[in-house]
Amino acid sequence: MISPFLVLAIGTCLTNSFVPEKERDPSYWRQQAQETLKNALKLQKLNTNVAKNVIMFLGDGMGVSTVTAARILKGQLHHNTGEETRLEMDKFPFVALSKTYNTNAQVPDSAGTATAYLCGVKANEGTVGVSAATERTRCNTTQGNEVTSILRWAKDAGKSVGIVTTTRVNHATPSAAYAHSADRDWYSDNEMPPEALSQGCKDIAYQLMHNIKDIDVIMGGGRKYMYPKNRTDVEYELDEKARGTRLDGLDLISIWKSFKPRHKHSHYVWNRTELLALDPSRVDYLLGLFEPGDMQYELNRNNLTDPSLSEMVEVALRILTKNLKGFFLLVEGGRIDHGHHEGKAKQALHEAVEMDQAIGKAGAMTSQKDTLTVVTADHSHVFTFGGYTPRGNSIFGLAPMVSDTDKKPFTAILYGNGPGYKVVDGERENVSMVDYAHNNYQAQSAVPLRHETHGGEDVAVFAKGPMAHLLHGVHEQNYIPHVMAYASCIGANLDHCAWAGSGSAPSPGALLLPLAVLSLRTLF
């Protein structure tokens, strides 16, 4: 057992020794501030170009505390103290806050929020691609209440569109881009109640293949929802949980192939080797399903079978950028959320770091002159780190103090609730007796729950590129797709962009017409 006095002594030592020498000089901070000021002054000249391309990065569950902790982790992975590190999203010039509540929930879920930031309207928790007039699980409240997404608006404008996720492709976030469902959990017809089936509602995997048949790129997990029940998985032949789930007997991957024009090149791949062997210049449509369910955590990923998020984004962009009219790409770092729900902060933060790497990859492959990039989260988590940790303290390490009550140490990372509530012999578990640096270590929580919960605070929105300045303050979450559509002249925002197809240069005044005068009918 670690002595409380030793913990405090170590903390004092680290505080003195981890201050970089250059930071002891006031001129370092003054020069840094002046450089930042100089860059800020350049922003007075706003980028009012048309956004030919729009990329939306969605970190599921990536609240501000997660962003900060991921920043420190990224720096420490590069052998720095961490706090001074800049994430790729930190480099974006415009930042806003998004209010995440659902129409019926103070603390939201990922389905209602996805409907907000993709379809432009707030909705009830647990529903996707429908207005708040639809009640969760009630199929008969769906018809007539469907709302379309920015992915649909982009496709209708002749742009290429893509979805890349580390979850299953029919999970909450991606499904709001193409589906209309009273329940986010209706992954296949196997998960639907008989009443919903009899009333004519379709499962989300079915809708993926039928609602917008020409989505150019789809990558993520979710193979088992595409195949008839008990169909053996190509990768996990002996795993019953990986087998097909569909009761209707449909092979949705074959159906996906049948919908593609014969003169186009469509490819289905199920592993990393096949994906990276593709020549994107000869791919028109791509479907990549790399796991039966969600993809593996980045720390657990098999380099032979599972591509990283960065690799999927690179392939997607090489395909989508061939369209001279531009593209819309939704990228989800979906397993940040799963790591937090399981209380596995190390998994969650490594997922966030990988998503940031994908953001950097996309930035290197596009230009701010014609590409609007937005990075945000759907909601936060009850994840925190603190305890007066010294500079350079491992983000997964101990705080330099002990509890006032049980005199035991604690990790800097803690959860408000979740599965990390551990009691040993009637007392809080002594973390010095366990491997708290393990990939699957569950950080301690204040309240015992099987799954840790979402947080209800605002989340950050980072933006760069054309019209990024429209994301500038505290906004309702459903405002985000209106900005993306306005910037790219799609959806309801066509009238002020009549010049866009003529090749003539826009005037800033034309692009800054009040949004209030625009008709919103095409959004719904």
From Swiss-Prot:
GO biological process: bone mineralization; calcium ion homeostasis; cellular homeostasis; cementum mineralization; developmental process involved in reproduction; endochondral ossification; futile creatine cycle; inhibition of non-skeletal tissue mineralization
Principal EC category: hydrolase
Taxonomic superkingdom: Eukaryota
Purpose: Alkaline phosphatase that metabolizes various phosphate compounds and plays a key role in skeletal mineralization and adaptive thermogenesis. Has broad substrate specificity and can hydrolyze a considerable variety of compounds: however, only a few substrates, such as diphosphate (inorganic pyrophosphate; PPi), pyridoxal 5'-phosphate (PLP) and N-phosphocreatine are natural substrates.
Active site: S110 (phosphoserine intermediate)
Positions of glycan attachment: N140, N230, N271, N303, N430
Cystine bridges: C139-C201, C489-C497
Organism, as annotated: Mus musculus
Positions of Mg(2+) binding: D60, T173, E332
UniProt topology in membrane: Lipid-anchor; GPI-anchor
Lipid-modified sites (GPI-anchor amidated glycine): G501
Cellular component per GO, a single term: mitochondrial membrane
Proregion residues excised on maturation: 502-524
Comment, domains: Calcium-binding is structural and does not influence the alkaline phosphatase activity. At very high concentrations, calcium can however substitute for zinc at zinc-binding sites, leading to strongly reduced enzyme activity.
Record comment: activity regulation: Phosphatase activity is specifically inhibited by 5-((5-chloro-2-methoxyphenyl)sulfonamido)nicotinamide (SBI-425).
Cofactor descriptive note: Binds 1 Mg(2+) ion.
Ligand binding (Zn(2+) 2): D337, H341, H454
Enzyme Commission (EC) number: 3.1.3.1, 3.9.1.1
Binding locations of Zn(2+) 1: D60, S110, D378, H379
The organism's taxonomic lineage, starting at the top: Eukaryota, Metazoa, Chordata, Craniata, Vertebrata
Subunit-structure text: Homodimer.
Post-translational modification as stated in the protein's UniProt record: N-glycosylated.
Range of residues in the leader sequence: 1-17
Keywords, ordered alphabetically: Biomineralization, Calcium, Cell membrane, Disulfide bond, Glycoprotein, GPI-anchor, Hydrolase, Lipoprotein, Magnesium, Membrane, Metal-binding, Mitochondrion, Phosphoprotein, Signal, Zinc
Cofactor: Mg(2+); Zn(2+); Ca(2+)
Protein's UniProt name: Alkaline phosphatase, tissue-nonspecific isozyme
Residues with Phosphoserine modification: S110
